[in-house]
């Protein structure tokens, strides 16, 4: 914990010293109004759930109905801070609907993505960043939740896919069907290549018991590891999970997939994680959040 706090202090000092002048040149001001901070495993957890609305008579689907449903079904986890509870999909009368509010329905469902962060870690991070930037608007979010949502913005035409988000301690697996998250699973990341593939295969096997698996896999990992992990998945006998001799397509997500979608300094080296954070923040701002 002491080392983590010191690392955060060094990061904050560096951003103030080097980032403020860059910001001044780019937008004419070096001040910060809000901070988005991504926190990864083992300090975060992400889950997805679906809630349903059914009435005997047709009803108008409203933001108030959604807010009431989210609040009434939300859960508290001891020693965990809920940092995100987003409605990421809406189904009216059996059809996925992008602009559902104000429309009439007989039945509806909402898909909710919820993120928790270890309370002590979140409070320490928020307190330190508020002190550095003199703003109360510090928003922590679970890293894999952010990246899952950013991938949807980066590849809007891939409506069915698996997303593998690999960090040093774990691999999160998200299943997207018809542009909706329907399942999230967690596999331990192991140093041994065979163990990592085995753990991922085990989680995919469990998901396949409930849903058909899409043929596209997006692989998110550090640039130094992504090529090796892509080869491991390519060499694994995954076809049996798809009941096919043809293996699924494994797409290693690279900075080049995202860089055209966000504005960045010409002198900066593309960093995939920062690009995905920027894309996420940009999309949320466009949605008025």
For the regions a protein language model found, what residue spans apply to each?
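Nucleotide/phosphate-binding catalytic cleft detector across ATP-hydrolyzing
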Residues: 1-34, 39-161, 210, 235-240, ...
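Short glycine-rich, Thr/Ser-proximal phosphate-binding strand/loop in the N-terminal lobe
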Residues: 1-2, 51-60, 179-196
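Hydrophobic beta-strand segments of well-ordered beta-sheets in folded domains
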Residues: 33-37, 211-220, 248-251
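A short acidic Gly-Thr/Ser loop motif
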Residues: 40-42, 155-156, 163-172, 176-179, ...
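Conserved structured catalytic cores and adjacent interaction surfaces
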Residues: 158-159, 181, 215-217, 266-268
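Nucleotide-binding motor/catalytic cores of P-loop/tubulin-like NTPases across gene-expression machines
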Residues: 181, 225, 236-275
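A short, acidic, amphipathic alpha-helical segment used as a generic capping/interface helix at domain edges
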Residues: 196-210
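Glycine-rich phosphate-binding loops at beta-strand->alpha-helix junctions
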Residues: 213-241
């Amino acid at each position: 914990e002491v080392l983590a706090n010191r690392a955060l202090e060094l990061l904050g000092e560096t951003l103030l010293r080097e980032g403020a002048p860059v910001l001044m040149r780019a937008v004419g001001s070096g001040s910060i109004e809000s901070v988005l901070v991504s926190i990864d495993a083992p300090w975060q957890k992400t889950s997805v759930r679906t809630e349903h609305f059914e009435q005997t008579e047709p009803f108008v689907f409203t933001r108030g109905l959604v807010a009431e449903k989210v609040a009434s079904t939300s859960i508290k986890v001891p020693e965990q801070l809920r940092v995100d509870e987003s409605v990421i999909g809406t189904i009216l009368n059996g059809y996925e609907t992008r602009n559902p509010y104000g429309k009439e329905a007989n039945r509806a469902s909402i898909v909710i993505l919820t993120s928790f962060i270890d309370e002590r870690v979140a409070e320490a991070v928020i307190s330190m960043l508020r002190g550095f930037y003199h703003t109360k608007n510090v928003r922590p979010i679970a890293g894999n939740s952010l990246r899952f949502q950013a991938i949807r913005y980066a590849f809007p035409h891939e409506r069915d896919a698996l997303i593998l988000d690999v960090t040093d301690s774990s691999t999160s697996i998200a299943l997207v069907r018809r542009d909706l998250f329907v399942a999230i699973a967690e596999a331990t990341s192991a140093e041994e290549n065979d163990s990592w593939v085995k753990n991922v295969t085990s989680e995919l096997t469990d998901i396949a018991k409930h849903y058909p698996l899409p043929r596209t896999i997006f692989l998110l990992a550090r640039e130094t590891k992504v090529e090796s992990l892509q080869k491991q998945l390519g060499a694994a006998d995954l076809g049996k999970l798809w009941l096919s001799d043809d293996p699924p397509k494994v797409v290693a997500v690279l900075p080049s997939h995202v860089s055209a979608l966000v504005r960045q300094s010409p002198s900066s080296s593309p960093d995939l994680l920062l690009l995905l954070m920027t894309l996420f923040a940009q999309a949320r701002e466009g949605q008025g959040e």
